[in-house]
Amino acid sequence: SVGGKTAIDLPGGKNLVGAFKQPVAVLCDLDTLDTLPKMFLADGMGEVIKYGMIRDEKLFELLEQHNLENVSSAMDEIVPTCIDIKRDVVEQDEFDTGERMILNFGHTLGHAVESYYHYETYTHGSAVAAGMCMMTEKTCTPELYVRLCDCVKAYDLPTEVPASLSELVPLCGNDKKRASAALRFIVCETIGKAEIRSMPFDEFAVWMGGDA
C-alpha cells in the first residue's frame, strides 16, 4: 500500500508485529469501487473522513456535501486527495516515529472497539469512525463534535458503541502507539489539523473516564 507498512495481528491487539517494505507500484482502479456492497464502501469512508479531519478541511467539506448514496460521483477527487495526504505524511516520517502517527486518528479507541467485540461486530472503518467521534467528544468543542458525527452518520457509520469507555480504555494499553508507561494518541481540535499527545496510561484512563 501507499506507505509500505505490513503487519500481523496478535491475540493482544492489531498490527503489533510489522515491517516496512515500500511497494514497486500502487494501482488504483476506481471502477472496482462500483462492485462493492454498500457496507464495504462505508467501511472505507471511515478512513476517508479521517484524512479530512487530520489534514484537509476542504476534503472534509466535500464529504459533508455527499453521503453514502452519492459519494461515488466524487471519488475522482477523493481518492487522489487521500493518497496525496498519506504520501506527504509518510515522506516526512517513513518509519512511524513522529508525524506519521497522525494517520492513527481514531485508531486508539477504534482498535479497542475491535478487540472488545472480538473483531466480529465492527469493521475496521466503522470502529475507527466511532473512535474518532469518542475522542473528539473529549477533546473538542461541541460544535466540532456534532459536525464530525453528522458526517460520520451520512456514511452509515457509528458515532459510538454500546461498550462503555471504562470497558474500552483498558484495551488501549495494547495499542502500538504506547511507549512504555505512556500512551500516545491523536486529537483534532480543528478540522484539518491533527496533534499528537502523550500522557501516562493511568492518567489517560482517568481523563477518558475509564478505570486505570
Residue ranges and their predicted role:
Residues 31, 106, 192:
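Anionic group-transfer/hydrolysis microenvironments
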Residues 1-66:
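A glycine/threonine-rich phosphate-anchoring loop and its flanking beta-alpha core
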